[in-house]
Amino acid sequence: MNIKLSVLDQSVGVVGRAQDQIIRQTVELAQSCESMGYHRFWVSEHHSHPGILGTAPEILMAAIAMKTTRIRIGSAGVMLPHYAALKVAEQFRVLDALAPGRIDIGLGRAPGSDRKTAQLLNPNQFASDQFPQQILELKAWLSGTPLPVGHPGHGVFAYPQSETCPQIWVLGSSDYGAQLAAHFGLPYAFAHFITDGQGVDQAMALYHNGFQSSDPLAKPKATLCVWALVAETRQEALRQFSSRARFKMDRNYGVISPLMTAQLAQASFKPEEMGALKQLEQKAIVGDAKEVGDQLRTLAERFDLDEIVVITWAHDPSVQQASYALLAEEMGLGQPAGGLKRALSSKTSEPIFSL
């Protein structure tokens, strides 16, 4: 089965590294992923979150566009209720002018923040029940289709216009997003990494069964965004996974902190936490390249996917890059000659710091 792989990077903060450096490393990672043969590179939007530093995907996408030539670049996503749909359309039309035919816009309705921060981002924010109307407007403005007579936006267009158009995706981790994507005939990305797979069967069924053909999407197009980590051995993969496990357990305690080293994370687990750690390990997609590749192929076959989006956290950027490189080789992404070797040996800044 031929599966395309894509990447979601959240610019995860890590202990001991400057936050501005983290943002620059996301751009470097996009360049590496392009050389490995990945299909898309998406970046996220979160606010007032010390563990996830990607706050302005549209700006980060522009930087990545200038440093890449082939890979598709996208937001995963733009939290649309914070913004006016027209302004978002203008931003992404500019991005499409910078990287014609390579721009994706993933849309979410979650705040990506706490309620206080969401209110400060947009004191006149749109209610979440206006999300469908915002999508309708955004579709029109991105495609250059006039809004109907009587609509407040009739006669208004988003510039610059061009022959290409950003591809809209609906993001979600519940039934709502699946049904919305199906109604509008848009591609759908299920956030498997948020739910650890819970709810995915029903969401995918709702999307496929309710899909209404649209221009330009005649049939359903869905993907899963999964958290995965690959190392030379399963033991090493689990060791590196301990950083994320510590993060998730701390979050359950109400503590949000930057990602710590695997060594510190392993030393931090208390005897009473070992059961919870074991459960996280069992749910996680971690291991050597074949183990992880087999799990991704199983998911692709189960949901009839031709593409999966992978998100990997690691304190050390070289560990993260090696994980993507090993997975690319296992899945036969067809990176240019020497691409894997370059990725594994590429120079990265020494370690220092999502959902």
PLM features: residue spans?
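Flexible, glycine-rich active-site loops centered on histidine and acidic residues
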Residues: 2-19, 81-146, 196
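Active-site mouth loops of central-metabolism enzymes
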Residues: 9-24, 78-86, 162-172, 280-288
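Conserved, mostly hydrophobic/aromatic
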Residues: 5, 33, 37, 45, ...
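A conserved active-site cap/scaffold subdomain adjacent to cofactor or substrate pockets
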Residues: 176-197
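Short, well-ordered coil/turn segments that N-cap beta-strands
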Residues: 1-5, 38-40, 68-73, 98-104, ...
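An alpha-helical appendage that flanks or caps ligand/catalytic pockets
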Residues: 125-157, 198-303, 335-355
